[in-house]
């Protein structure tokens, strides 16, 4: 079997990893072996956190809606149940935005949910 020297291919593969590791501290950004480990870890974290971000924002919206709803004298669960019964189709992201940016209109939404 013929011997294969992997000069160009190996260099390109290593440089690709080192390019991804640019900005990492110390040997993590300059030495291929540690850079490869750090890049794999970083990509795993990025994949996981893209999914976690959706959960985190939903929790944030719910906390904001709950705080604003309690100021208006109703709990989060009663507010959401009332909105469902009143057939008010507005999502949590928009409700949280209303609660922060325009409390007066949020109060009108709460009164619609109460009745």
From Swiss-Prot:
Residue runs in coiled coils: none
List, in alphabetical order, the GO biological process terms annotated in this UniProt record.
ribosomal large subunit assembly; translation
Annotated Gene Ontology cellular components are: ribonucleoprotein complex; ribosome
**Per its record, what are the GO molecular function terms?**
rRNA binding; structural constituent of ribosome
Xref: InterPro entries: Ribosomal_bL20, RIBOSOMAL_L20_CS, Ribosomal_protein_bL20_C
Name the keywords, alphabetized: Ribonucleoprotein, Ribosomal protein, RNA-binding, rRNA-binding
PANTHER family, sorted: 39S RIBOSOMAL PROTEIN L20
Similarity-based family: Belongs to the bacterial ribosomal protein bL20 family.
Q: What does this protein do?
A: Binds directly to 23S ribosomal RNA and is necessary for the in vitro assembly process of the 50S ribosomal subunit. It is not involved in the protein synthesizing functions of that subunit.
What is the name attached to this protein's record? Large ribosomal subunit protein bL20
Organism listed in the record? Synechococcus sp. (strain CC9902)
